[in-house]
Regions:
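N-acyltransferase acceptor-side catalytic subdomain
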Residues: 1-186
Length: 186
C-alpha cells in the first residue's frame, strides 16, 4: 500500500480519559498466556463485526508462529478470570506487526495496547505497525506513513535485536500497575 499505519513508540499518547479509567479498572494483564484464545476472540463475529478474515487455517498458522516465538499476545482478564480483551501480532527483529484486537469490556483492548507499547519500548523495539489508521487508533498517535518512510524504518527494525531479557516476558500486571520492569505504570 502507498500508506501504512504506524504508532511511533516515542510519541505514544495515552488519552487522559483512558489514563483515569486504567486506575479504576481492576483488570489483570498477561503476556503470551492465552494466545489462541485471543486470536479466536478477535475472529468472533459480533453485532458490530459481521465478517472476519480470521479463519481456522489462520488460527493454526498464527498459533504455529506463536509456538516458534514469532507471534505474541497481550491478554486482559476480569476479576472473574474471564478474557475480556486483548491483541496479538507478529514480532520480527525490532518490528511488531499488530494483527487484531478485541474488547468485551470497557477499555480492555485499549489497556492491552498501552501494555504492548510499554513492552516494546522496554525491549528496544523500533517499529509498531498497525497496518492502517482509524479513529480508534488515532487517539493514541497512530500516523499514516508514506511507503518510502515506512520501508526505511522497517529495514532498520528488521535488522535490530531487541533486548531478549525484556521481550515479551510472561508478566502479570494489574491494569495500570506493573509487577515487571518491562511493563510500567502509565
Amino acid at each position: 500500500p502507498e500508506e501504512r499505519g504506524v504508532l511511533p513508540l516515542d510519541t505514544f499518547n495515552v488519552p487522559r480519559g483512558l489514563a483515569r479509567a486504567m486506575k479504576k479498572h481492576d483488570y489483570v494483564v498477561t503476556i503470551d498466556t492465552a494466545f489462541e484464545g485471543v486470536i479466536r476472540a478477535c475472529g468472533t463475529l459480533t453485532k458490530e463485526r459481521k465478517e472476519t478474515w480470521i479463519n481456522e487455517q489462520l488460527v493454526q498458522l498464527y498459533t504455529a508462529l506463536f509456538h516458534a516465538g514469532h507471534a505474541h499476545s497481550i491478554e486482559v482478564w476480569s476479576t472473574k478470570n474471564e478474557l475480556v480483551g486483548g491483541l496479538y501480532g507478529v514480532s520480527l527483529g525490532g518490528a511488531f506487526f499488530g494483527e487484531s484486537m478485541f474488547s468485551r469490556a470497557p477499555d480492555a483492548s485499549k489497556i492491552a495496547l498501552v501494555h504492548l507499547v510499554e513492552v516494546l519500548r522496554g525491549a528496544g523495539y523500533i517499529l509498531l505497525d498497525t497496518q492502517y489508521v482509524n479513529e480508534h487508533l488515532k487517539q493514541f498517535g497512530v500516523e499514516a506513513w508514506s511507503k518510502r518512510r515506512y520501508m526505511t524504518k522497517l529495514e532498520k527494525a528488521l535488522s535490530a535485536s531487541p533486548n531478549p531479557s525484556t521481550r515479551f516476558s510472561t508478566a502479570s500486571v494489574r491494569s495500570g500497575v506493573a509487577s515487571s520492569s518491562s511493563v510500567k505504570r502509565i
